[in-house]
Amino acid sequence: MTTIFDLLGKDADYLLNHKCVIKKEALTLPSGDLVSRVFAESDRNNRVLRSLQQMFSCGRLGGTGYLSILPVDQGVEHTAGASFAKNPMYFDPENIVRLAMEAGCSAVASSYGVLSILARRYAHKIPFLLKLNHNELLSYPTTYHQIFFSQVEDAYNMGAVAVGATIYFGSESSSEEIVAVAEAFARARELGLATVLWCYLRNPHFVVNNVDYHTAADLTGQADHLGATLGADIVKQKLPTLQGGFKTINFSKTDDLVYSELSSNHPIDLCRYQVLNSYCGKVGLINSGGPSGQDDFAEAVKTAVINKRAGGMGLILGRKAFQRPFSEGVRLLNLIQDIYLDPTISIS
């Protein structure tokens, strides 16, 4: 049987024994009492605390302070055909929820249509996270503009415990999206719902000399900081792959200490800088799994190890799981969860 160590391959020592530049003692780290220890001291009402605790208590990671969320909103974001042609069973929303339940996930995140059509059957069995806004791909030329497909009240009425939204920070529509999401999240808190923000970057000026800085630790870290500023309980971010975005794009501001004292080029240090920007871990960082490819198991394991050792709160992984046979999707999600359950894989 292939082990986590086998899947890490030549990177095993590099990832498992790294010591971070920013010490873990500077962070608020995931633990079973996280809701009581962190959020109970905030202005969040008791119903929000209950909703958060439902996610942190569900599935194989229940009681650990970590989350394993299955997100399937790609039918809107990337078109249904592109998302489900490899595995047509997921055109049926019920199989999305079944996958999350069978794999022992903390929650299932999807669109209003997917979750509402199954709410009476499943909302009391697994936490629902309603994704409120989406970017659709039928318009030409392609634009990056998140549009609300549903309202916070829809989440409340179907029995969801949380709402999610995306902001394309840096895009032409970012100011409009910030205002809309701030209003939606304020309403969600009134209704007792937890909030998760997809803190993505979209700006053509973030690509310089054919180098894409949309996954730079400094730029994505600032997006996380903006998400925390909006009051998100959890921020979702792509795993950082490089550093120095601010130094290259020639606008906005940074400090040389960011690169000399607060991070390095090691992937765990890059991810830790994201955690640092998420209020030193008080707002949980979950990283995304990315698209499906030939080495999904190895890539997913590395992403989980990096996130955990950096002080992150878990993974929100979709395409790698549902664009393969059902049983393999369950196995992949369980493998990721095993990393967060393994006490020998420690926070750096």
Swiss-Prot record:
Which GO-annotated molecular functions does the record name?
fructose-bisphosphate aldolase activity
List the InterPro entries hit by this protein, alphabetically: Aldolase_TIM, DeoC/FbaB/LacD_aldolase, DeoC/FbaB_aldolase, FbaB-like
Record's catalysed reaction(s): beta-D-fructose 1,6-bisphosphate = D-glyceraldehyde 3-phosphate + dihydroxyacetone phosphate
Catalytic site positions:
236
GO cellular component terms, semicolon-separated = cytoplasm
An example Pfam family from this entry, by short name, is DeoC
| Major localization listed first in the record, in broad terms | cytoplasm
- EC number(s) in its UniProt entry? 4.1.2.13
Superkingdom of origin organism: Bacteria
* Gene Ontology annotations of biological process type: glycolytic process
Write the record's keywords in alphabetical order, separated by commas: Cytoplasm, Glycolysis, Lyase, Schiff base
Its localization reads: Cytoplasm
Give the similarity note.
Belongs to the DeoC/FbaB aldolase family. FbaB subfamily.
What name does UniProt use for this protein?
Answer: Probable fructose-bisphosphate aldolase class 1
In which organism is this protein found?
Chlamydia trachomatis serovar D (strain ATCC VR-885 / DSM 19411 / UW-3/Cx)
